[in-house]
Amino acid sequence: MKKISNNIFLIMLIFGTLVTISSNSWLGAWMGLEINLLSFIPLMNDNKKNLLTSESSLKYFLTQAFASSILLFAIIMLMFLYNNNLSLYNSFNEILILSTLLLKSGAAPFHFWFPEVMEGLSWVNGLILMTWQKIAPLMLISYNFIYNFFMISIILSMLIGSLGGLNQTSIRKLMAFSSINHLGWMLLAMMNNEMLWMTYFLMYSLLSFSIVLMFNNFKLFYFNQIFNLSMMNPIIKLLIFLNLLSLGGLPPFLGFLPKWLVIQNLTAMNQLFILTISVCLTLITLYFYLRLSYSIFMLNYQKNSWMLKNNFNNKMSSISLIFNFISIGGLVMISMIYIIM
């Protein structure tokens, strides 16, 4: 019964996003966002015995409900001003709408809820929050943005996403700050090319799915669990290490490709200042990924009895290896296809 209800909520979740991105009015987009929100809340409460999960779902609901209320207020104000032939909405109202959409997507400076909510979720729900739940807000943001306000959000997202992950011991919080950093890159791509941010989002979703699949199969939530896992299987340790570097955007992995496309686009547009800041802040994310990887490879940890159980079945192993191969060697394959063509 629970599985059937979860499938219904998952279908409604997808339906809500499709309603938002296909709507031709702000009110229809708002309704789609609400359907999406009310479908995701039951999915978040997959473990009612875990108080941290209940706390995360409550935080998510309060944050999204507040953003939806402000968005509805801004939409009503927009309709009122438009019907009365007033042009006052051009400044305040656009900032209000953009702020609520940035809050819903978890971009800085409205990111405060995102790491805390991620900490209490399962890996499957965390993956949905990092990927699918960003589609509708980002699509609406692409319709309506203010350059100066947008630029502030981009720089803050990259800065907080980089510095926030430095002293983390929780993998879920690290992935949350990494998502904030990548969101800054998506917004930067959105400023110059509408298709570019979609390409970046697809690549990021693929990389996130690849690494979250491994974390979920091994029930990894904290770094010390990865250290103990390294005593069991060096190959799995290596795959996690390479996936982290790919997610950080280090060449020659697939994660470098979307950043490379954004860098090329910014260079062509002669936006060298924001490009320099973006690359420098991305180096910080690579630093804490490399620091974590160094600890996994070089340091020895005592084997704990609770880590002896291997949850990695053959079916999931095959799926994970396929996605890991794409994540790690995708850029090489794309380069070979490009050379052949």
Swiss-Prot record:
It is an enzyme of class 7 (translocase). Its EC number is 7.1.1.2. The chain crosses the membrane at residues 8-28, 61-81, 95-115, 145-165, 174-191, 195-215, 238-258, 272-292, 321-341. It holds the Pfam family Proton_antipo_M. Keywords: Electron transport, Membrane, Mitochondrion, Mitochondrion inner membrane, NAD, Respiratory chain, Translocase, Transmembrane, Transmembrane helix, Transport, Ubiquinone. It comes from the Eukaryota. It is a multi-pass membrane protein. GO terms for biological process: mitochondrial electron transport, NADH to ubiquinone. It catalyses: a ubiquinone + NADH + 5 H(+)(in) = a ubiquinol + NAD(+) + 4 H(+)(out). GO terms for cellular component: mitochondrial inner membrane; respiratory chain complex I. Core subunit of the mitochondrial membrane respiratory chain NADH dehydrogenase (Complex I) that is believed to belong to the minimal assembly required for catalysis. Complex I functions in the transfer of electrons from NADH to the respiratory chain. The immediate electron acceptor for the enzyme is believed to be ubiquinone. This is NADH-ubiquinone oxidoreductase chain 2. It comes from Anopheles gambiae (African malaria mosquito).
